[in-house]
A protein has these predicted regions:
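Positively charged n-region of N-terminal signal peptides that target proteins for export
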Residues: 1-4
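Hydrophobic alpha-helical transmembrane segments of integral membrane proteins
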Residues: 10-11
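Serine-esterase "nucleophile elbow" of acetyl-processing enzymes
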Residues: 18-94
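Alpha-helical cap/lid subdomain in secreted, periplasmic
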Residues: 59-65, 81-217
Length: 217
Protein backbone atom coordinates (compact mmCIF):
# COMPACT_ATOMS: atom_id res chain seq x y z
CA UNK A 1 0.00 0.00 0.00
CA UNK A 2 2.80 2.39 0.88
CA UNK A 3 4.49 1.73 -2.46
CA UNK A 4 1.22 2.45 -4.27
CA UNK A 5 0.77 5.73 -2.38
CA UNK A 6 4.31 6.80 -3.18
CA UNK A 7 3.74 5.93 -6.84
CA UNK A 8 0.51 7.96 -7.00
CA UNK A 9 2.12 10.94 -5.28
CA UNK A 10 5.02 10.70 -7.71
CA UNK A 11 2.56 11.07 -10.58
CA UNK A 12 0.38 13.78 -9.05
CA UNK A 13 3.12 16.17 -7.92
CA UNK A 14 4.54 16.78 -11.44
CA UNK A 15 0.98 17.23 -12.73
CA UNK A 16 0.23 19.81 -10.03
CA UNK A 17 3.49 21.66 -10.65
CA UNK A 18 2.78 21.69 -14.38
CA UNK A 19 -0.68 23.15 -13.80
CA UNK A 20 0.71 25.82 -11.50
CA UNK A 21 3.41 26.67 -14.02
CA UNK A 22 0.83 27.15 -16.78
CA UNK A 23 -0.30 30.48 -15.32
CA UNK A 24 -0.68 31.90 -18.83
CA UNK A 25 -2.78 28.86 -19.83
CA UNK A 26 -0.62 27.94 -22.82
CA UNK A 27 -2.45 24.61 -23.03
CA UNK A 28 -5.83 26.17 -23.71
CA UNK A 29 -5.25 26.65 -27.45
CA UNK A 30 -2.23 24.39 -28.03
CA UNK A 31 -4.24 21.77 -29.93
CA UNK A 32 -6.28 24.33 -31.86
CA UNK A 33 -3.14 26.21 -32.86
CA UNK A 34 -1.58 23.02 -34.20
CA UNK A 35 -4.62 22.54 -36.44
CA UNK A 36 -4.42 25.99 -38.06
CA UNK A 37 -3.30 25.34 -41.64
CA UNK A 38 -4.12 28.72 -43.18
CA UNK A 39 -2.96 32.05 -41.82
CA UNK A 40 -6.02 33.80 -40.37
CA UNK A 41 -6.93 37.31 -41.41
CA UNK A 42 -7.12 38.29 -37.75
CA UNK A 43 -6.54 36.81 -34.32
CA UNK A 44 -8.73 38.27 -31.60
CA UNK A 45 -6.73 38.33 -28.36
CA UNK A 46 -8.48 38.92 -25.08
CA UNK A 47 -10.27 37.63 -22.00
CA UNK A 48 -13.75 36.17 -21.46
CA UNK A 49 -15.36 38.86 -23.61
CA UNK A 50 -13.33 37.61 -26.56
CA UNK A 51 -13.57 34.00 -25.35
CA UNK A 52 -17.35 34.06 -25.55
CA UNK A 53 -17.61 35.73 -28.94
CA UNK A 54 -17.09 32.64 -31.17
CA UNK A 55 -19.81 30.83 -29.24
CA UNK A 56 -22.25 33.74 -29.53
CA UNK A 57 -21.57 34.34 -33.23
CA UNK A 58 -19.54 31.52 -34.83
CA UNK A 59 -20.33 32.69 -38.36
CA UNK A 60 -18.59 36.00 -37.72
CA UNK A 61 -15.35 34.11 -37.23
CA UNK A 62 -15.72 31.46 -39.94
CA UNK A 63 -16.93 33.85 -42.65
CA UNK A 64 -14.14 36.37 -42.04
CA UNK A 65 -11.27 33.93 -41.37
CA UNK A 66 -10.92 35.18 -37.81
CA UNK A 67 -9.51 33.15 -34.93
CA UNK A 68 -10.55 33.75 -31.32
CA UNK A 69 -7.88 33.49 -28.66
CA UNK A 70 -9.62 34.84 -25.58
CA UNK A 71 -9.25 33.17 -22.19
CA UNK A 72 -11.73 33.85 -19.42
CA UNK A 73 -10.36 35.67 -16.40
CA UNK A 74 -7.02 36.63 -17.91
CA UNK A 75 -5.17 39.83 -17.19
CA UNK A 76 -2.88 41.58 -19.68
CA UNK A 77 0.31 40.03 -18.29
CA UNK A 78 -1.05 36.55 -19.02
CA UNK A 79 -1.99 37.54 -22.56
CA UNK A 80 1.48 38.94 -23.12
CA UNK A 81 3.08 35.67 -22.02
CA UNK A 82 1.09 33.60 -24.52
CA UNK A 83 1.20 36.17 -27.32
CA UNK A 84 3.84 34.31 -29.35
CA UNK A 85 2.08 30.98 -29.25
CA UNK A 86 -1.47 32.24 -29.72
CA UNK A 87 -0.83 35.12 -32.14
CA UNK A 88 2.62 35.40 -33.72
CA UNK A 89 2.99 31.71 -34.59
CA UNK A 90 -0.35 31.80 -36.46
CA UNK A 91 0.94 34.55 -38.82
CA UNK A 92 -2.25 36.63 -39.06
CA UNK A 93 -2.49 39.90 -40.95
CA UNK A 94 -4.05 41.59 -37.91
CA UNK A 95 -4.25 41.07 -34.17
CA UNK A 96 -7.23 42.65 -32.43
CA UNK A 97 -6.36 43.36 -28.80
CA UNK A 98 -9.18 43.80 -26.29
CA UNK A 99 -7.59 43.71 -22.85
CA UNK A 100 -7.71 45.30 -19.43
CA UNK A 101 -11.09 44.39 -17.95
CA UNK A 102 -9.68 41.81 -15.54
CA UNK A 103 -6.78 44.03 -14.55
CA UNK A 104 -9.33 46.62 -13.46
CA UNK A 105 -11.37 43.85 -11.79
CA UNK A 106 -8.23 43.03 -9.76
CA UNK A 107 -8.01 39.41 -10.88
CA UNK A 108 -4.29 39.48 -10.11
CA UNK A 109 -4.35 42.08 -7.35
CA UNK A 110 -4.76 45.83 -7.26
CA UNK A 111 -4.33 47.36 -10.69
CA UNK A 112 -1.21 49.25 -11.68
CA UNK A 113 -2.54 51.24 -14.63
CA UNK A 114 0.91 51.91 -16.08
CA UNK A 115 1.83 48.22 -16.03
CA UNK A 116 -1.46 47.23 -17.61
CA UNK A 117 -0.99 49.81 -20.33
CA UNK A 118 2.62 48.71 -20.76
CA UNK A 119 1.54 45.12 -21.33
CA UNK A 120 -0.82 46.26 -24.08
CA UNK A 121 1.95 48.33 -25.68
CA UNK A 122 4.30 45.34 -25.50
CA UNK A 123 1.77 43.20 -27.37
CA UNK A 124 1.63 45.87 -30.08
CA UNK A 125 5.43 45.98 -30.24
CA UNK A 126 5.61 42.20 -30.63
CA UNK A 127 2.99 42.25 -33.35
CA UNK A 128 4.69 44.98 -35.36
CA UNK A 129 8.10 43.32 -34.99
CA UNK A 130 6.61 40.23 -36.63
CA UNK A 131 4.80 41.96 -39.48
CA UNK A 132 1.37 41.82 -37.85
CA UNK A 133 -0.83 44.92 -37.76
CA UNK A 134 -2.25 45.56 -34.27
CA UNK A 135 -5.74 46.92 -33.79
CA UNK A 136 -6.46 48.30 -30.33
CA UNK A 137 -9.91 48.21 -28.78
CA UNK A 138 -11.32 50.17 -25.90
CA UNK A 139 -12.24 48.26 -22.78
CA UNK A 140 -16.02 47.89 -22.85
CA UNK A 141 -18.06 49.64 -20.14
CA UNK A 142 -18.64 48.25 -16.65
CA UNK A 143 -19.59 49.79 -13.32
CA UNK A 144 -18.82 46.74 -11.17
CA UNK A 145 -17.67 43.13 -11.35
CA UNK A 146 -19.93 40.50 -9.80
CA UNK A 147 -17.00 38.19 -8.97
CA UNK A 148 -15.08 40.98 -7.21
CA UNK A 149 -17.71 43.28 -5.65
CA UNK A 150 -15.06 45.03 -3.54
CA UNK A 151 -13.65 46.81 -6.61
CA UNK A 152 -14.74 50.45 -6.72
CA UNK A 153 -14.55 53.12 -9.40
CA UNK A 154 -14.62 50.62 -12.25
CA UNK A 155 -16.27 52.96 -14.75
CA UNK A 156 -13.76 55.72 -14.09
CA UNK A 157 -10.78 53.36 -14.28
CA UNK A 158 -12.00 52.03 -17.61
CA UNK A 159 -12.27 55.56 -18.99
CA UNK A 160 -8.74 56.32 -17.80
CA UNK A 161 -7.23 53.20 -19.37
CA UNK A 162 -9.13 53.77 -22.60
CA UNK A 163 -7.76 57.31 -22.82
CA UNK A 164 -4.22 55.93 -22.51
CA UNK A 165 -4.86 53.31 -25.17
CA UNK A 166 -6.50 55.76 -27.58
CA UNK A 167 -3.69 58.30 -27.19
CA UNK A 168 -1.06 55.64 -27.86
CA UNK A 169 -2.99 54.38 -30.89
CA UNK A 170 -3.23 57.85 -32.41
CA UNK A 171 0.43 58.65 -31.77
CA UNK A 172 1.53 55.38 -33.36
CA UNK A 173 -0.96 55.29 -36.25
CA UNK A 174 -2.68 52.18 -34.92
CA UNK A 175 -6.39 51.72 -35.57
CA UNK A 176 -8.52 52.15 -32.45
CA UNK A 177 -11.96 50.59 -32.11
CA UNK A 178 -14.09 52.49 -29.62
CA UNK A 179 -16.57 49.96 -28.29
CA UNK A 180 -16.98 51.96 -25.09
CA UNK A 181 -18.63 55.05 -26.58
CA UNK A 182 -21.05 52.94 -28.62
CA UNK A 183 -22.12 50.69 -25.74
CA UNK A 184 -22.13 52.74 -22.52
CA UNK A 185 -25.28 53.90 -20.76
CA UNK A 186 -25.79 56.96 -18.56
CA UNK A 187 -24.01 55.23 -15.65
CA UNK A 188 -20.92 54.52 -17.70
CA UNK A 189 -21.80 50.83 -17.68
CA UNK A 190 -23.56 48.41 -20.00
CA UNK A 191 -27.35 48.36 -20.29
CA UNK A 192 -28.97 45.00 -19.57
CA UNK A 193 -29.81 44.54 -23.23
CA UNK A 194 -26.10 44.48 -24.03
CA UNK A 195 -24.88 42.51 -20.98
CA UNK A 196 -27.13 40.60 -18.59
CA UNK A 197 -24.41 40.46 -15.92
CA UNK A 198 -23.05 43.94 -16.57
CA UNK A 199 -19.80 42.68 -18.10
CA UNK A 200 -20.21 39.98 -20.74
CA UNK A 201 -21.98 41.00 -23.95
CA UNK A 202 -25.22 39.52 -25.17
CA UNK A 203 -25.59 38.75 -28.87
CA UNK A 204 -26.88 42.30 -29.30
CA UNK A 205 -23.74 43.61 -27.63
CA UNK A 206 -21.51 41.50 -29.84
CA UNK A 207 -23.37 42.76 -32.91
CA UNK A 208 -22.39 46.33 -32.03
CA UNK A 209 -18.79 45.25 -31.56
CA UNK A 210 -18.83 43.29 -34.81
CA UNK A 211 -20.01 46.28 -36.81
CA UNK A 212 -17.33 48.55 -35.38
CA UNK A 213 -14.54 46.01 -35.81
CA UNK A 214 -15.37 45.23 -39.42
CA UNK A 215 -15.12 48.92 -40.25
CA UNK A 216 -11.56 48.93 -38.91
CA UNK A 217 -10.40 45.94 -40.94
Amino acid sequence: MRKICVFIIGILIPMMVSAQNDWANYNRYAEANAQVTEAPKAVLMGDSITDGWPFADPEFFSENNFVGRGISGQVTSQMLLRFRQDVIDLHPKYVVILAGTNDIAENSGKIDMDKTFGNIVSMCDLAKANGIKPILCSVIPATSFYWHPHVTGAAEKIVKLNAMIEKYAKENKIKYVDYHSAMKDERGGLPESLAKDGVHPTREGYDIMKSLLLKAL
